[in-house]
């Protein structure tokens, strides 16, 4: 008989149900907090996991019913070393998906950890416990990925990486758009709202040969260039200084 098997981990639950638009199906406890439910049909339906703890029901969306947010072209270009828009594939991105059970919002996470045995994402959205948010490996690319329903912009997060010696280590996101102020080290989910207004400059650049033009790079450290300034204050002073000195680029 055609059916769909759903497995989920709810270690302390007294009972677990899988809820679809058609109703609830009770799951069977297999072992070690792993529960299994069998749904009729061949297509994976929109569903949620209902975990019962005493008199309390906890309703949540399953991260693993969503397709990977990193596509085949991303992994191919990344493996070739030719991916030129990595900030769109890796890091943390707020997303919303339609569903028969209602619109689902959350955050997709992706990180490159080619030598990891396993990777989990931890943060404010899961009590810093990655048990239910172990990330999926994207084949030989070394990329790990997961979509976490219910995660919100502004929440802190880190990646928890298992080394070959089986030890776990917490790491900040190298592709994060925002981070905590030191000495705290967590990354922060942040949506990009910047509107570029450099069409004229981009059009002018398109007509030039970058290999034939001059280049003079001004290398600087933001924190020590002129201490006490914000990013915007630095920008106001830096551009005029660089132009006056005759540099063409800033690092």
Model-derived regions, located:
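Short beta-strand and strand-turn-strand segments in soluble, beta-rich domains
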Residues: 127-130
């Amino acid at each position: 008989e055609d059916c769909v098997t759903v497995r989920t981990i709810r270690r302390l639950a007294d009972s677990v149900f899988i809820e679809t638009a058609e109703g609830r199906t009770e799951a069977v406890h297999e072992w070690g907090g792993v529960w299994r439910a069998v749904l009729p049909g061949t297509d994976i339906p929109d569903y949620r996991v209902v975990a019962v703890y005493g008199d309390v029901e906890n309703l949540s969306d399953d991260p693993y019913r969503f397709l990977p947010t990193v596509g085949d072209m991303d992994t191919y270009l990344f493996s070739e070393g030719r991916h030129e828009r990595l900030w769109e594939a890796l890091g943390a991105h707020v997303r919303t998906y339609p569903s028969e059970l209602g619109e689902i919002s959350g955050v997709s996470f992706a990180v490159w950890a080619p030598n990891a045995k396993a990777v989990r994402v931890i943060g404010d959205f899961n009590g810093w416990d990655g048990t239910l948010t172990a990330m999926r490996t994207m084949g030989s690319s070394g990329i790990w990925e997961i979509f976490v329903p219910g995660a919100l912009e502004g929440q802190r997060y880190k990646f928890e990486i298992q080394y070959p010696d089986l030890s776990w280590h917490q790491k900040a996101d190298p592709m994060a758009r925002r981070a905590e102020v030191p000495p705290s080290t967590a990354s922060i989910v942040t949506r990009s709202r910047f509107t570029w207004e450099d069409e004229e400059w981009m059009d002018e650049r398109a007509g030039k040969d970058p290999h034939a033009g001059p280049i003079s790079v001004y290398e600087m450290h933001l924190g020590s260039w002129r201490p006490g300034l914000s990013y915007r204050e630095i920008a106001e002073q830096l551009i005029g200084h660089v132009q006056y000195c005759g540099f063409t680029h800033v690092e």
